[in-house]
Amino acid sequence: TAHEDVKFGFSLQAGDALEAVRRAADDPALELRGLHSHIGSQIFDTAGFEVAAQRLVRLMAQARADLHVAMTELDLGGGLGIAYVAADDPEPLASLASRLLEIVRAECERHDLPMPRVAVEPGRALVGPAMITVYTVGTVKDVDGIRTYVSVDGGMSDNIRTALYDADYTVTLANRAPAGPLSLARVVGKHCESGDVVVRDAWLPTDIAPGDLLAVAATGAYCRSMASNYNLVPRPPVVAVDATGSRVLLRRESFADLLACDVG
């Protein structure tokens, strides 16, 4: 999202952003409070946010000089990364927030602007790690010399991110201790699509069998909101668990739910 050739936002280079500020400031039905940007997803360092802050504060200074418009809020958007696999190393939110404040403060001092109220949108960073999806193994297919395909009772209807974004996840055998060595496996769904993949490359025990449970971590962001009833598959329930027990937040869909909107 952080370049010119996208459908989002107003171009700084073409002057569209400053024109949007002018129109908002001139509209009596609007109260212009500040600027917002969004630079991407799964961001693990502050370099991109630093560039965004520099450009936004520069725009705030330009709006003050050219339009006599003062703004008091600066939203640097979302995109803060989380750990889907071992190689992902996100910065803790508290230290990241401190660094972002330092960046904005330095830019404001450079342009002689008062420090605005700074906001970020850590949606994925908050809810992503809070959910684990548990699947039941249906079939296991060994392709000699290549890999093992482990089919589960879900797939792209409850998590389309692997097929859509080539997203990667960590998966673990959840119902017992493994008894065999590890081998390369691909966890796939039950849908009639070759791209219906849950985890593209995973090291799973060779004794994995139908009925085993696989836990896929960090599925709290976007999976449920992007879920569908493709192939007329009901969506699974969402269950909250803590030290005191569990409770259902969203019930499992039924086949009656799938037909509820049919009127013909």
Where are these regions (language model features)?
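Active-site-proximal beta-alpha core segment in soluble small-molecule metabolic enzymes
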Residues: 1-73, 82, 103, 108
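Short, glycine/charged-enriched secondary-structure capping and boundary segments
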Residues: 1-3, 39, 49-50, 89-91, ...
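Structural preference for beta-strand elements that scaffold enzyme active sites
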Residues: 7, 31-36, 71-75, 115-119, ...
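Short, flexible micro-motifs
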Residues: 12, 37, 43, 80-84, ...
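Conserved residues at the C-terminal ends of beta-strands
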Residues: 38, 77, 217
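Glycine-rich phosphate/ribose-binding loops and adjacent secondary-structure elements
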Residues: 49, 55-59, 63-67, 72-132
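Charged (often Lys/Glu-rich) extended helix/loop segments that serve as interaction or gating elements
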Residues: 99, 105, 113-264
